[in-house]
Regions:
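Predominantly a Rossmann-like dinucleotide-binding segment in NAD(P)-dependent oxidoreductases
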Residues: 127-244, 386
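Contiguous beta-strand/loop segments that form the cofactor/metal-binding neighborhood of enzyme cores
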Residues: 175, 199-306, 346-358, 376-379, ...
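Beta-loop-alpha module in the N-terminal Rossmann-like domain of NAD(P)-dependent dehydrogenases
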Residues: 20, 39, 50-113
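Rossmann-fold dehydrogenase core element
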Residues: 109-127, 146-150
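C-terminal helix-rich "cap/oligomerization" subdomain common to oxidoreductases
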Residues: 1-2, 70-73, 338-340, 347, ...
Length: 403
């Protein structure tokens, strides 16, 4: 639904909310009209911090505010679908954080309701809006590495920036602990994977020039040894946000695309699953016919070329290697060389605002968000069943089945 100015009501004041609010406030075509949270005191605190006039502790009441034409949903995953449907029925445009939904049926219901209501629906897939990742895609699009054929993703230890917004809150805090609860975060026993894999798969398709993933094979390993063997216990001395799943660890995921020449792998080696990788956070290598790109993502640190820190390195077959840095002030949450919370969310929300004021579809729609949930479900099904899983064969019933 096209609007001349985006007037936002944001619901859910957890870790990512401040990044969204700052992005709206920095844009000339947007205004944050109100914020909403069950914790009324927190809502008042955030409203005072950012100069927001209205606060609500009831989502339905906020939807009745005629000044609001757009709703930004940054609540825990189990609330996404119901809130999105209510917002669509109230005639509000919607930006819903990832993961889009807990089940395929409810995600499809949201897409259908938004279409019926004639409102715009975007899913908040911020990884594909990181400056470093977008630069990698631009280099691929201009043919710098030839046809991209393989994605290699590394997932190392993430370190929070001491004193960063919200990081003083314990992991069990209401605003953070939901990500470890499969009833609220999803994952059928793998809540961390469900919350994050949508990012990894979205990036894997984006850097393969939007080629769709066809099937997924995930390796599950038992984590009993982490508790039994003191010499190999995971390092919990740093301010890590997450821990291995109680259902087991998924350290490796592989996938193929519709194009049989293309494939990908994600590998997790960090302190929380008892491993060491000198590369921090998320990073990606894209291997093409005539070159390769190495690029940092969320929480990324440790990439270098010729003794200098780099955010992206472009290797050309038989040609010059080139490195890039993006001077965006680092990250407000992670001890990272690249800006995720600050810049990626600003880029994403800029795309959303632009789509609304132009009356066009945003770059990442509800259909895209639903597809990445399906891909993540395929990975979890594969880990539980021990077999490769085709996306076309994933159903809510299969995903929810006990291993």
């Amino acid at each position: 639904m096209k609007v001349s100015k985006v007037r936002v009501g944001l619901v859910g004041l957890g870790l990512v909310a401040a990044s969204h609010i700052r992005a709206y406030l920095a844009h000339p075509d947007a205004e944050v009209v109100a914020i909403c949270d069950l914790d009324a005191a927190r809502a008042e605190e955030i409203a005072e911090q950012f100069g927001i006039a209205k606060t609500y502790s009831d989502f339905d009441e906020m939807l009745g505010d005629g000044e609001i034409n757009t709703v930004d949903i940054t609540t825990p995953t189990f609330l996404h679908a119901a809130m999105s449907i209510k917002a669509a029925r109230a005639g509000k445009n919607i930006l819903c954080e990832k993961p889009f939904c807990l089940a395929l049926a409810e995600g499809q219901a949201v897409c259908d309701e938004a279409a019926r209501a004639g409102v715009t629906l975007m899913v908040g897939e911020s990884y594909v809006f990181m400056s470093s990742i977008m630069k990698a895609r631009a280099l691929i699009d201009t043919g710098e590495i030839g046809k991209p054929q393989q994605i290699r993703q590394r997932f190392g230890t993430w370190l929070e920036r001491p004193g960063a917004h919200d990081t003083e809150r314990a992991i069990t805090d209401t605003h953070r602990g939901w990500r470890l609860d499969t009833s609220r975060a999803g994952g059928a026993g793998f809540p961390w994977m469900f919350d994050h894999c949508v990012h990894f798969f979205a990036t894997a398709e984006y850097l393969m020039r939007d080629a769709r993933i066809k099937d997924v094979y995930a390796l599950k390993s038992d984590i009993g040894w982490m508790h039994e063997d003191r010499d190999h216990a995971p390092d919990t001395s740093e301010t890590h946000m997450y821990r291995p799943e109680t259902a087991g660890d998924i350290p490796i995921i592989t996938w193929t695309y519709d194009d049989p020449a293309c494939q990908g792998v994600w590998m997790r080696a960090e302190a929380l699953n008892g491993k060491y990788d000198p590369m921090f956070g998320f990073s990606v290598s894209v291997i093409g016919e005539t070159g390769m790109i190495e690029v940092l993502g969320e929480g990324g640190r440790g990439l270098a070329w010729q003794g200098r820190d780099a955010h992206l390195v472009l290797h050309r077959k038989g040609g010059e290697t080139q490195s890039f840095c993006f001077d965006e002030g680092g990250d407000e949450i992670w001890q990272s060389d690249v800006s995720y919370y600050s810049r990626a969310h600003k880029n994403q929300i800029g795309e959303f605002i632009g789509a609304l004021t132009r009356g066009t579809l945003p770059r990442y729609t509800g259909t895209d968000g639903l597809h990445q949930v399906r891909t993540t479900m395929a990975a979890i099904c594969s880990a539980k069943e021990g077999v490769p899983v085709r996306l076309a064969d994933v159903t809510d019933a299969r995903y929810s089945r006990e291993a």
